[in-house]
Amino acid sequence: MAMAIDGYECTVCGDCEPVCPTGSIVFRDDHYAIEADSCNECTDVGEPRCLGVCPVDLCIQPLDD
């Protein structure tokens, strides 16, 4: 499973990018996105780190299959 950023909710603050241990959060086309193929939902710490720093509720959610 992977996480996804809602482009409508994202304020483009950039807080999530530096905390991603896999480098899965990228800035392209004027918004942040999570590359699903490399996102592991930070399984080593129990919760995605991006969720802990994002100031917007429901901006980052599990990716729908």
From Swiss-Prot:
PROSITE patterns cross-referenced by the UniProt entry: 4FE4S_FER_1, 4FE4S_FER_2
Q: Which organism is it from?
A: Azotobacter vinelandii
User: Which Pfam family, giving just one, matches this sequence?
Assistant: Fer4_7
Detail which positions bind [4Fe-4S] cluster 2: C20, C39, C42, C50
Q: Which cofactor does it need?
A: [4Fe-4S] cluster
Q: Does the keyword Metal-binding apply?
A: yes
* Binding-site list for [4Fe-4S] cluster 1: C10, C13, C16, C54
Co-factor note (free text)? Binds 2 [4Fe-4S] clusters.
Q: Which UniProt keywords apply?
A: 4Fe-4S, Electron transport, Iron, Iron-sulfur, Metal-binding, Nitrogen fixation, Repeat, Transport
InterPro entries, sorted: 4Fe4S_Fe-S-bd, 4Fe4S_Fe_S_CS
Domain (4Fe-4S ferredoxin-type) ranges: 2-30, 32-65
Q: Tell me the disulfide pairings in this chain.
A: none
GO MF terms here are: 4 iron, 4 sulfur cluster binding; metal ion binding
Name-wise, this protein is: Ferredoxin-like protein in vnf region
**This protein's record includes keyword Transmembrane helix:** no
Example of a GO biological process term: nitrogen fixation
